[in-house]
Amino acid sequence: MWLFTVNQVLRKMQRRHSSNTDNIPPERNRSQALSSEASVDEGGVFESLKAEAASPPALFSGLSGSLPTSSFPSSLVLGSSAGGGDVFIQMPASREEGGGRGEGGAYHHRQPHHHFHHGGHRGGSLLQHVGGDHRGHSEEGGDEQPGTPAPALSELKAVICWLQKGLPFILILLAKLCFQHKLGIAVCIGMASTFAYANSTLREQVSLKEKRSVLVILWILAFLAGNTLYVLYTFSSQQLYNSLIFLKPNLEMLDFFDLLWIVGIADFVLKYITIALKCLIVALPKIILAVKSKGKFYLVIEELSQLFRSLVPIQLWYKYIMGDDSSNSYFLGGVLIVLYSLCKSFDICGRVGGVRKALKLLCTSQNYGVRATGQQCTEAGDICAICQAEFREPLILLCQHVFCEECLCLWLDRERTCPLCRSVAVDTLRCWKDGATSAHFQVY
């Protein structure tokens, strides 16, 4: 019985409570809901997002009229009218305001700090506006990123453009200079061709060792002598041979092109003399000078030639720097001569060091290995790997490879490693031992 009575009492209380809540006005019901939400989030950091279902149509009518302040809760309200495009943002309420609403239970609207309104002709939502601004800034940054070309690139383009415009005039100037000095250019080309032919032919004869041709060597000597005498005789009025013995040629004025002409002729003549001396060494028979020792003489002759060739232009450059005109500044000429002498002294010291090393190598005997026994020659196949013939005076290196003495000496005049295993065999000067002559043009 008592359970039945309690059940009836509970049903009556439930019906009464439901009737009371149904009769509450909408404004009070809404205020109680906001009060309960504020009491849950006392910090006010995370406000609930509520969309007003019963808001009047005038809420999204634009900015033509004044908006009522009591129609927005202290939260973020996003909405759009039928036309689309009206957006309102309300900043979150502070802690004090949230607490006040929780205590009082009534809702007090706070004036929004930021109010963004986009008309229907501009867009549909705030997110599109923010995204568009972000894309706009990124596009502007992307446009500025490539920027203008680097200064070096722009300068290079300017130089190329200038060359394109000035190239015809440069070619005209070069053509004029070549026509003015056509005789000197032709003589220099002819002497350079003669030197290249004689140098390559001599190296070929040196590589033949005892099989060299004496007739070819005599032809080289005659060819070089004929070219030298022809040039000196043709320009005998200038007395170009005086520069070979450090005397002044017969020229009224010495300009830059005359200086190059005299220095060039003297340098080619000295090269011809160097090749002629090497031809005499090649022509010597084996009884007088062994093949393995000829490379040392080639080296000494070349070093002495380069030293003498570097000394010949000195007096010519002194004369050109000081000049014959008395109006020239002696102070400037003296300074330039001192600078030239300093630079030239370093070059001469290097040449003297090369001559000293070559003479030291000439006076010392060079042993590339020891005599090989018959058993070692048999193990090596009785055939030299260089000349592909039977061993003659075989030598065995530290790497246990056997070669002919002459073949090995000729090989090590060009290289410093074993022909088979490429291990280092010697560590001495090997330049110019093959009979070659330097093609360097000694201008200064």
Curated annotation (Swiss-Prot):
CDD domains, sorted: RING-HC_RNFT2 (cd16742)
Membrane topology, Extracellular segments: 1-181, 236-255, 351-444
GO cellular component: membrane
One Gene Ontology term of the molecular function aspect: ubiquitin protein ligase activity
Compositionally biased residues, Basic and acidic residues: 131-140
Source organism superkingdom: Eukaryota
ZnF RING-type span: 384-422
UniProt cross-references to SUPFAM superfamilies, sorted A to Z: RING/U-box
GO biological process: positive regulation of ERAD pathway
Signal peptide residue numbers: none
Cytoplasmic side: 203-214, 277-329
Segments of skewed composition (Basic residues): 107-121
Keyword Glycoprotein: no
Name the record gives this protein: E3 ubiquitin-protein ligase RNFT2
